[in-house]
Every structure is written in structure tokens, then in C-alpha cells.
Amino acid sequence: MKAKPSHPAFSMSTSLRVSPSIHGYHFDTASRKKAVGNIFENIDQEALQRLFRNSGDKKAEERAKIIFAIDQDLEEKTRALMALKKRTKDKLFQFLKLRKYSIKVH
């Protein structure tokens, strides 16, 4: 009986290889959607709120308002969204800490 090879990568077929450029083939990127700077460019505020709400976001309206604020530049929007995320995380920690102390007291 022959032992099986210890390196299965050598017996891999050409159809399972990751890079098509080995054989001179190229990925077809012409049909891909072009990247945009603002991913929320073609969406209205209500649809964005619905998207956030459906994903379980408790502050969907506030988050959508931050994104659609016209007077803020990109850095201000990023800071506002990060602050909103931090406040949510802080409230969670406060809740967990309060729960921990209430269990010890009783």
C-alpha cells in the first residue's frame, strides 16, 4: 500500500487555483460597479433609517440624520457616528456593571 502524499496542494487541479493569472487569464472587472466616495449617495433618509432599524439599530433615526446632515463635512460625520457608537457602548457597560452590582447586593 502506498502512503498518501502529505502535501495535497500539489495534487490540486488547475480549476481550483486561486489566481487565474498563472495561465494568462484575467478577471473581468469591466462589468463591475464603479466605486463611489459616498455609499449613501443614491438613497433617501427614510430608506436609510429603515435599513438601520431592520439591522437592530436602536438609534436609526439619529444615525441617518448624522449621515444626511448637509452642513457637516466627512470628518465631522465620522466623528459624530463614532461618538454615537461610543455612547451606545458606554451605556451597555453601565447596564452590565449595574446588573453585576445588583446581583451582589441581593
UniProtKB/Swiss-Prot annotation:
GO biological process: apoptotic process; cellular response to heat; endothelial cell activation involved in immune response; negative regulation of apoptotic process; negative regulation of Notch signaling pathway; positive regulation of non-canonical NF-kappaB signal transduction; positive regulation of protein kinase A signaling; regulation of cell cycle G1/S phase transition
Matches recorded under Pfam families: TC1
Keywords: Apoptosis, Cytoplasm, Nucleus
GO MF annotations, alphabetized: Notch binding
Residues annotated as signal peptide: none
PANTHER family with a match to the protein in the record: TRANSCRIPTIONAL AND IMMUNE RESPONSE REGULATOR (PTHR32358:SF1)
Protein name according to UniProt: Transcriptional and immune response regulator
Organism: Bos taurus (Bovine)
